[in-house]
Amino acid sequence: MIVGHGIDLQDISAIEKVYLRNARFARKVLTDKELALFEQFSHNRKMTYLAGRWAGKEAFSKAMGTGIGQLTFQDIEIINDSKGRPVITKSPFQGKAFISISHSGGYVQASVILEDLA
């Protein structure tokens, strides 16, 4: 049974402005595994990746019904599988979490659906 659905839309340039003011912003949003991948990318790809992870984690927190205030960005990890599909590999949710991240123009959109397996 679906127990939560969250969506977030993020302007990539807004994330870039924050990152350029303080590169530690990436460390706040990304887990160690996500950060290791982030460090391998070109600047433009870094900004798209960071915005996508931000949007994905915001969408997850909305699906949980808590908002990011009761969760931290470090509580949620999103890693791409071998086909490039984003997968939530770490979260406080005990059921199944589905995520989709889409990039278009200067924006990133993420959608998360939470399913209770009980």
Curated annotation (Swiss-Prot):
Domain of life: Bacteria
Family stated for the protein in its record: Belongs to the P-Pant transferase superfamily. AcpS family.
InterPro entries recorded: 4-PPantetheinyl_Trfase_dom, 4-PPantetheinyl_Trfase_dom_sf, ACPS, Ppantetheine-prot_Trfase_dom
Encoding gene per record: acpS
A GO biological process held by the record: fatty acid biosynthetic process
Organism, scientific name: Streptococcus equi subsp. zooepidemicus (strain MGCS10565)
Protein name, entry field: Holo-[acyl-carrier-protein] synthase
Enzyme Commission no: 2.7.8.7
Function description: Transfers the 4'-phosphopantetheine moiety from coenzyme A to a Ser of acyl-carrier-protein.
Keyword Cytoplasm: yes
Gene Ontology terms, MF aspect: holo-[acyl-carrier-protein] synthase activity; magnesium ion binding
Keyword DNA-binding: no
Binding-site residues, Mg(2+): 8, 58
Stored Gene3D superfamilies: 4'-phosphopantetheinyl transferase domain
GO cellular component terms, semicolon-separated: cytoplasm
Catalytic activity: apo-[ACP] + CoA = holo-[ACP] + adenosine 3',5'-bisphosphate + H(+)
Subcellular location field: Cytoplasm
Essential cofactor(s): Mg(2+)
